[in-house]
């Protein structure tokens, strides 16, 4: 994913945590914040060290990033932070995708219906 689509600075994360809305399911917590300055979404991913070793954490992050790449055209211009919870470490890529799509629909980040 290009740099323009990433949230990297701690101050950005803190602002979204403070001012954004959160939605959760068992596997993920999603914070969203309407960013009026950008014409596209920005994504921040947080996977705690409690979830496992670096291989496990990176696998989860890759699956989350891939899901956003697939739906790139259908996502509203918002700042989005995805936090992985403990059950996500035991899921395969397809399960992560369906769970993430579920929580993103609840968070209303899609601009049209997703199957």
Swiss-Prot record:
Biological process, per Gene Ontology: tRNA 5'-leader removal
InterPro entries per UniProt: Ribosomal_Su5_D2-typ_SF, Ribsml_uS5_D2-typ_fold_subgr, RNase_P, RNase_P_CS
EC number: 3.1.26.5
Enzyme class: hydrolase
An annotated GO cellular component: ribonuclease P complex
UniProt keyword Nuclease present: yes
Gene3D superfamilies documented for this protein: 3.30.230.10
Keywords: Endonuclease, Hydrolase, Nuclease, RNA-binding, tRNA processing
Catalysed reactions, as listed in the record: Endonucleolytic cleavage of RNA, removing 5'-extranucleotides from tRNA precursor
Keyword Electron transport: no
Pfam family, one: Ribonuclease_P
Single annotated GO MF: tRNA binding
Family: Belongs to the RnpA family.
PANTHER family xrefs: RIBONUCLEASE P PROTEIN COMPONENT
Subunit structure comment from the entry: Consists of a catalytic RNA component (M1 or rnpB) and a protein subunit.
Record function comment: RNaseP catalyzes the removal of the 5'-leader sequence from pre-tRNA to produce the mature 5'-terminus. It can also cleave other RNA substrates such as 4.5S RNA. The protein component plays an auxiliary but essential role in vivo by binding to the 5'-leader sequence and broadening the substrate specificity of the ribozyme.
Protein name: Ribonuclease P protein component
Protein's organism: Staphylococcus epidermidis (strain ATCC 35984 / DSM 28319 / BCRC 17069 / CCUG 31568 / BM 3577 / RP62A)
